[in-house]
Amino acid sequence: MTGRTGFTLVEVMIVLAIVILLAALAWPSYAAYVVRSKRVEAVSALMETMQQQERLYSRRNRYLAFSRDDNPERLRWHSAADPRRSSHEISARPCGEQSLAACVELVAVPGSAAVDSAFRDPVCGTLTLNSQGVRSPEHAACWQ
């Protein structure tokens, strides 16, 4: 036998198969982690925006409805620091039939056209939080 060094094709294929198997096992956990982290980011943005709404209420005795296109107070309408990296678009509206003097509801919509449109949250979907403390969905994992 001569002094050849290197790997045979069979050895390379075995290593490649092992790497693919490990990646296939790790990918679902990684994807679930990304969704959870984006959800936490959205919840944090909702809480921060609600605090801004409460400050506005203390000055004006009413809350402010806003959206990405209509935002006179420049409240945060996206979940991350940069809209292009955000997973949720945030807006505010009156709660049901109540006026803005009584209640405001913040809505975080995942994967809209103004933010990362590829993002989906199959467990929680759209998150809502109102000034009376009611939030939906009520699933505990959505608010952790």
Placement of each model-derived feature along the sequence:
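N-terminal single-pass transmembrane signal-anchor helix
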Residues: M1-Y33
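Periplasmic/extracellular, small/polar-rich flexible segments of pilin-like filament-forming proteins
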Residues: R59-Q144
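Residues at secondary-structure transition points
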Residues: R4, Y33-V40, S44, S99, ...
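Membrane-proximal N-terminal amphipathic helix
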Residues: V35-R62
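Aromatic side chains
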Residues: F7, Y30-Y33, Y57, Y63, ...
